[in-house]
Amino acid sequence: MKTLSKILLTLSFVLSVTTSAFAVTVVSWGGAYTESQKLGYGDPIAKALGIEINWVDYSGGLSEIKAQKEAGAITWDIIDVFAMDTINGCDEGLFVEFDFDKDFPPAPDGTPASKDFFTSMPSKCAVGNILYSWNY
């Protein structure tokens, strides 16, 4: 539940617009994975904020992100990327760096974002929201 709260808090901040004319594009991996994101927090936050979320599937990597930046035509707002792509994209200036306590509001209980988010992730350009592991 804490992870879901973090995701919703992040999306609430990023999408803190009250006009229904606003839309955001979220890019993810497609299939059941994207559908779970859409149903779990995309649809609820879109309804709560009265906005539209456009979902786009991609196959990973940084090439499409680089092409958008080089063309000056960035159309993606939130991107689900692997940790290594986050590190490389941040180092290459493809992503925005966050100051977690300045750029994000505190949690409902007052906890600052730097203490509430997965800020130990390998980049200042990302808010970690998906954890997984392989068990052998």
Predicted regions and their residues:
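A generic local structural motif
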Residues: L11, S63-A67, M121-S123
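Sec/Tat signal peptide C-region and signal peptidase I cleavage site
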Residues: V17-A23
